[in-house]
Regions:
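Local sequence-structure signature of Cys/Sec-based thiol-disulfide redox active-site neighborhoods
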Residues: 1-28
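Residue-level signal for short amphipathic helical patches enriched in basic/charged
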Residues: 7-13, 35, 51, 69
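Conserved short-loop catalytic and cofactor-binding motifs
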Residues: 10, 32, 44, 66
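Short alpha-helical
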Residues: 13, 39, 64
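Thioredoxin-like thiol-disulfide oxidoreductase module
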Residues: 33-51, 77, 81-84
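Structural micro-motif
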Residues: 48-57, 67
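Non-catalytic, surface beta->alpha helical segment in thiol-disulfide oxidoreductase systems
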Residues: 58-84
Length: 84
């Protein structure tokens, strides 16, 4: 299973929803809190081209935010990505 990384902040409700969805599916992930260090946001922009949160990566592939994660989950494509 590829690594899943969630870039988030403490004040973002969509970040909480994304992490909750991953938890409910039993998908392990690493959470990177952008509040901890401003350099993390620069790294996020470099990796994804976006500065909004949450941003979710599966392996080194950015998939977007909570809406994209939910759509992948509902379509069954999230399981496919994680099985690769």
């Amino acid at each position: 299973m590829p690594d899943v990384t969630v870039y988030s902040t403490t004040w973002c409700p969509y970040c909480d929803r994304a992490k909750r969805l991953l938890d409910q599916r039993g998908i392990p992930f690493t959470s990177v809190n952008l509040d901890d260090d401003p350099r993390f946001r620069s790294a996020l922009v470099e990796l994804t081209g976006r500065s909004t949160v949450p941003q979710i990566l599966i392996g080194s592939e950015p998939i977007g935010g909570f809406s994209e994660l939910r759509a992948l989950d509902q379509s069954g494509k999230l399981a496919e990505l994680l099985a690769a």
